Amino acid sequence: MKPLLTWLTLAALTISPMVHAQATNYPVTVQSCDRSVTFNAAPQRAVSNDVNLTKMMVALGLQSHMVGYSGITGWNKPDPALLHDLGTLPELSSKYPSVENLLNANADFYFAGWNYGMRVGGDVTPQSLATLGIQTYELTESCAQIMPRAEATLDDVYNDLLILGRIFNVQDRAQALVADMQNRLGRVHEQLAGKAPPRVFLYDSGEDRPMTAGRLAIPQALIRAAGGSNVMADVSASWTHVNWESVVQSNPEVIVIVDYGEVSAAQKQQFLENNPALQSVDAVRNKRYVVLPYVAVTPGIDNVAAIETLAAAFHDVAR
């Protein structure tokens, strides 16, 4: 438990009263994975991919700088509140957008990530878009797909919000959002002292081989911050497939089920309970499951809410 408490203590101690942020002085250069990207002005025709990235844009009040979004309804049930906030902005593609989708929208900026709107070796990449006058900022967690990275932490999310704040000259909003997330995390931490971490497995999808989160994916940070121990923390990968044998050997006490896609969370739970190979697993025997939506377990503004839910489930602490 000591590493968890040490990390959370440091996070809590870094919370400081907000000061007025300086306006962005263009041109501004930011780091995006292994690239430096320079912006001469705030983008005016931005596109975000996936629900978690789009919610970051909306939380920063950037709808007036956007021409659309993509990758939401093809994977998730539409969130009425988010759709309301997006107003008349169109969904350019229900899943990953094509180069043509972005060109037809006359986009000048693409906020996406590797496996969050871009694929290694695909047509839509920062390099291919740059030749067309479209600048790209890559989700920090996703950089693990193209370069060596350390264990995922909430600093990855804070980094994305603060960099977006610099790119769009909304640094006050970004800093306020990060401070609120840190303060909520601090309140969770106060309730975790002396509590032993349960063994936790995140089940995303898959029957033959389950998709889960290794230590380079953000659920590693969420589980740890909630006072749990990710049984796949020794897997040096982000979102990845493992075999059921490794799940049985690790014997998780809690299983987190990601609710999205065509297979419901209830169907995923039923599959786990009917899988003969898992009958000895503590979480299955004790029916100890936590269901979280996709948007909560991918990097974004819902991560602290996920931590609050997990902490309540792991340790019966107040939310």
Predicted regions and their residues:
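Bacterial N-terminal signal peptides that target proteins for export
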Residues: M1-L8
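N-terminal signal peptide c-region/cleavage motif recognized by signal peptidases
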Residues: S16-M18
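Boundary of Sec targeting at the N-terminus
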Residues: Q22-T24
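Extracytoplasmic substrate-binding proteins
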Residues: Y26-T29, S36, V124-G206, K287-R319
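Short helix-initiation/N-cap motifs at beta->coil->alpha
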Residues: S32-D34, L89-E100, V120, V235-W244
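A short, structured surface patch at a secondary-structure boundary
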Residues: S48-A105, F109-M118, V231
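Solvent-exposed loop/turn segments at secondary-structure junctions
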Residues: N52-K55, I72-W75, F109-Y110, N115-R119, ...
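Alpha-helical, coiled-coil/dimerization segments enriched in small aliphatic residues
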Residues: T212-W239
